[in-house]
Amino acid sequence: MFHLVKGLYNNWNKKEQYSILILGLDNAGKTTFLETLKKEYSLAFKALEKIQPTVGQNVATIPVDSKQILKFWDVGGQESLRSMWSEYYSLCHGIIFIVDSSDRERLDECSTTLQSVVMDEEIEGVPILMLANKQDRQDRMEVQDIKEVFNKIAEHISARDSRVLPISALTGEGVKDAIEWMIVRLERNKKSRPPIYK
């Protein structure tokens, strides 16, 4: 009888775990975003001034509430590392694509890179959140300019949830709003991409 009750208790108390892939070109602020996110959820985080370019991946698991866990994979954005992004597509429930809104010169490269992500069949139906990072800088592009680039790609996304939001990973502005947007989409998409229960 004890084992039955224990089994029922464990089953009812399982948490949904969703995996979110953080992508973007090198120097877009992906790791800063992840470390700021950890700080927002009161977890141990790396001092922002100590962040180095990611070679490989950074992983963080963030308990959002009593029922959900978000597992983030921050994958290096250097051109030589982008070929390994596709290895994560079938495992992810959502994608956050971070754009350096102060780097106009790489906007075309960013657009081409995002388009190659969107066109991959493995992420069909996965919500995509594009974050216009570094909005705290004076030389930033307006969010509307970045949306225009994203809108050209959005026609390939069809009915999938997608959005462009402004953030500053450095100051934390907009970071929690972005995650809240993603959580709603992950729950909405539960039937086509079920979470892992932990």
From Swiss-Prot:
One of its GO terms (molecular function) is GTPase activity. Keywords: Acetylation, Golgi apparatus, GTP-binding, Isopeptide bond, Nucleotide-binding, Protein transport, Transport, Ubl conjugation. Transmembrane segments: none annotated. Pfam families: Arf (PF00025). The modification N-acetylmethionine is found at residue 1. One of its GO terms (cellular component) is Golgi apparatus. InterPro entries: P-loop_NTPase, Small_GTP-bd, Small_GTPase_ARF, Small_GTPase_ARF/SAR. It is found in: Golgi apparatus. There is a cross-link at residue 50 (Glycyl lysine isopeptide (Lys-Gly) (interchain with G-Cter in ubiquitin)). One of its GO terms (biological process) is Golgi to plasma membrane protein transport. Gene3D superfamilies: P-loop containing nucleotide triphosphate hydrolases (3.40.50.300). It comes from the Eukaryota. The keyword Transport applies. Signal peptide: none annotated. PROSITE patterns: ARF (PS51417). Belongs to the small GTPase superfamily. Arf family. NCBIfam families: small_GTP. Interacts with SYS1 and SLO1. Present with 1920 molecules/cell in log phase SD medium. Involved in the targeting of ARL1 to the Golgi. Can bind and hydrolyze GTP. This is ADP-ribosylation factor-like protein 3. It comes from Saccharomyces cerevisiae (strain ATCC 204508 / S288c) (Baker's yeast). The gene is ARL3.
